[in-house]
Amino acid sequence: MLEDKINKVMGKVAQLNGDVYHESFYNPHPYPGWCPELKHIMWGFIKELKEKEAAGVATKVDLETLSELFDVIIRSSDMLLKNNEFKQKTKVFVKAVNAFNYKLLNALSEANGNEVKNVFVSPGRLQAMLVLLSNWVDWYYKRDRILDAICCKDMNPMEVNEMFADERYLIPYVNKEKMDEGYIPTIELKTMMWYKKGLNLSKRYLIDTEKPFHVLFKALDFDSPSASDNIKHLVKNASHGLINDLQIELTNETRALLVDVLYFKATWQSLFDEDCTRTRNFYYKGGSSKVKMMSVTDVFRYYENDTFQSISLDYHSHAKTRNYSMWIHLPKQGHKIKEVLAQITEEKIGTKYKQAEVHLNLPRFELESKTSLTEVLKVLGMEGIFASDDVIPNLLKDVKIDDIVQQGRIEVNEAGTEAAMATYCVMFTGCPPHEKPKPIEMKVNHEFIFEVVEAYTGIRLFSGFVNNL
């Protein structure tokens, strides 16, 4: 009888360990981590033990079993509380990542104006790089502005670090070995920082970011003819050949280069039949072009309103639930991408999808892009990191960010999707040592104004002007 109770509790704990996200296992009040089923077993056993004590038949084994049950339930409760905390943090984190995603897309759309231009970016990787940089900037000035611009102002800075460094939050299944070819997506991530040989990095901040953020730091002679080729070769390998030629220019002013490479490959849950692919028109502002249009009829998650249609194309996975999908948002006749962006920014599209049979025509496409994000980031409130000649003093002194760029490639066909994105930040010396600027000429040889000013408050102690001497 008692062994059966222990086994029942242990079985429930094992079940909880295997499915910690199942909503029914959470009792929101008063003990969030306690499973109601475990409590029922516990109180039932206590009642039985009290009856035995009242009858004078309680044994030492009964008491030991009670103690063991308490221990099991307390430990399982602690486990559930921790996972519930992880779940709540993830919600906050995902909200920030998605908010920045649409904030960046809207800014890029505004920057394009009426220009017919494709955009391919990875907002999450840009956001992650900016979080990494925020650890090296002046915390009391630029860091808050960075976190505000990337939609993380309401989060504790230490938690921001924890979440962006922990791959479970940002990219589930990243850098995992494939369980079976063609099923679980291949997702790989590498972050590297090259700095000029002879420069000294702060050991404290190097240690604080190297392991948590999985950054490979390496000294490099940027003046060497092979330096650029070495970097391009590593990026090519990290992107599985999709980014064949990273478009960087190293000069004798280059002091550091921070590069983040994300690679993704997956097959569709519902494959497109190549025999059904036909040549069709693709219309754009001012004209049309011939494309290979794929076709499939199947049950998909789908949503539409008066402005746009939206569909979720799932990728194959070993997980019990979907882990990666491609969402397509299609403006209806008379509506533009800007209008759709405005709506999907506000709406939680993922919660609106319903199962529906859809006949889908989707163009087979390949996009290659190189996008300088410097001006867009300035618009989003990060002028400070580009204006300073000593932008990351906590790690490396006297360097200036020249540009932040994303260069990538995506291929979408009947089998699935393959994509890679390199996010890189080029840093120059704040004041090139080989180029000493000429002093500005100022000859005070005619009338002038003078002021004696208190530096902190700006209060003028004395002011005046001189007309003659």
Language-model segments: which ranges?
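Secretory/exported precursors with cleavable N-terminal leaders
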Residues: G18, E23-P36, H40-G44, D62, ...
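Short terminal alpha-helical segments
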Residues: E3-E23
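Intrinsically disordered low-complexity regions specifically enriched for long asparagine
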Residues: M1-D4, D62-T65
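Surface-exposed receptor/substrate recognition regions of extracellular proteins
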Residues: K52
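Compositionally biased, intrinsically disordered low-complexity regions
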Residues: K12, L66-S67
